[in-house]
């Protein structure tokens, strides 16, 4: 972040630097500040493709699932990648669409992608399907880790949407 701050001081009207700062802020769990930077980046002419997926994450962290999903859809139409698919699937699950979320994950699940399987368990837990989530965790994780994560998973459906996004993305 120090490097980016210096870059911003040297080139305060560089949209790409603002976009990078926005991405850094979202990963530092400061989504409101991230959205400010993304807005500045856009005003300065930075291409949205530089930050769509991270802006979607910032919006998810603020409980703005509809806006987040629009960002993810656009990001996926420009440059599909597994991480953005997982973010989009989680956002759908938070919005109460667990089956649609799992449908998006299906190619990764068939490829035995561990991140996708963990996310599938979270999707189910967010939607109150704790027995199914527990089965997945027990089948895909070492026993000690599974036992540590199950109590956490079974609380996900009690959180608000912003908290669910934060819990899933940052633990």
List the predicted regions and their residue ranges.
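Canonical tetratricopeptide repeat
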Residues: 3, 20-21, 54, 87-88, ...
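Register position in tetratricopeptide repeats
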Residues: 10, 27-28, 44, 61-62, ...
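TPR alpha-solenoid repeat register
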Residues: 17-18, 51, 84-85, 116
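Residue-level signature for tetratricopeptide repeat
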Residues: 24, 58, 91-92, 123-124
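TPR/TPR-like (Sel1-like) alpha-helical repeat modules
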Residues: 76-80, 98, 107-116, 122-148
């Amino acid at each position: 972040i120090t490097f980016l701050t210096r870059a911003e001081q040297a080139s305060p009207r560089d949209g790409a630097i603002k976009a990078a700062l926005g991405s850094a802020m979202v990963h530092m769990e400061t989504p409101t500040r991230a959205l400010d930077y993304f807005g500045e980046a856009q005003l300065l002419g930075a291409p949205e493709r530089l930050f769509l997926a991270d802006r979607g994450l910032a919006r998810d962290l603020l409980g703005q699932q509809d806006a987040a999903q629009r960002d993810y859809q656009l990001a996926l139409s420009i440059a599909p990648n597994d991480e953005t698919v997982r973010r989009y699937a989680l956002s759908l699950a938070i919005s109460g669409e667990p089956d649609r979320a799992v449908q998006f994950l299906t190619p990764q699940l068939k490829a035995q992608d561990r991140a996708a399987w963990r996310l599938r368990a979270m999707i189910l837990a967010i939607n109150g399907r704790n027995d199914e989530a527990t089965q997945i965790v027990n089948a895909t994780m070492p026993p000690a880790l599974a036992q540590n994560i199950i109590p956490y998973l079974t609380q996900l459906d009690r959180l608000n949407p912003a908290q669910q996004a934060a819990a899933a993305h940052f633990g």
